[in-house]
Amino acid sequence: YCMMDGTFQNTKLFKGEYNVRIDGPFIPLVRENTDGTLLHDGSVNTEISGTTKVKFEVQPFLNVEFVGDPQVSNGVIKAQVRVTRGVSDEVFREKIQPMGNWKDEYLNVTDIQFFVSYSNTVGYRARDERWSSSISYEGKSFEDLLGKEVIVQSNGSIPSGRKVFVRAAARINYDTPVGSGTRRWNYSEPVEVLIP
């Protein structure tokens, strides 16, 4: 199963020849048009026997990073986050539009999440909902904020003496795999925060 460091482990596979493909918040490695015609195949055919390493180079939709260190005041964590495009609008359109059903709103950044957790694997599936927060954006309203610092902060008051981990995430209005209804986040690195 997928690990937070991007590796995948499944110990229940039989020895044999496999076609390996991945989906995530990046330009799809396998692209087909609406009638099923293959446009690009970045999957890998490989023999799996024991531990097998397969490396995929991907083009993320977004890059998310903290600017400076998160600050704590009265149990509330504030941080500055910068979101930039991982690929230009032109490259995104060039690779996605031929797949069909193109919509300009695919490029829209829809939300920024600020995940807080006791776990160093902090993220959507490992977050404390009491303290995690989100900011939603409609239409193209985030466009002017690309490359600029956005302030995020935790909800509630985290008790003194706790050690938590924070991570920011952002996503665009595009499903991966196409038509799945799943819009995936691009994440920052996790950061440890001590609550004084």
Give the ranges of each region predicted by the language model.
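A short, solvent-exposed beta-strand micro-motif common in secreted/extracellular proteins
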Residues: 6, 16-34
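Short amphipathic, basic-aromatic surface patches that mediate peripheral association
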Residues: 82-104
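Beta-strand-rich modules
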Residues: 15, 19-20, 147-149, 154-180
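Short beta-strand elements
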Residues: 175-196
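Structural beta-strand segments of beta-rich domains
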Residues: 75-79
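Structured interaction patches on ligand/partner-binding surfaces of diverse proteins
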Residues: 26-55
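Short, surface-exposed beta-strand/beta-hairpin micro-motifs centered on an aromatic residue
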Residues: 3-12
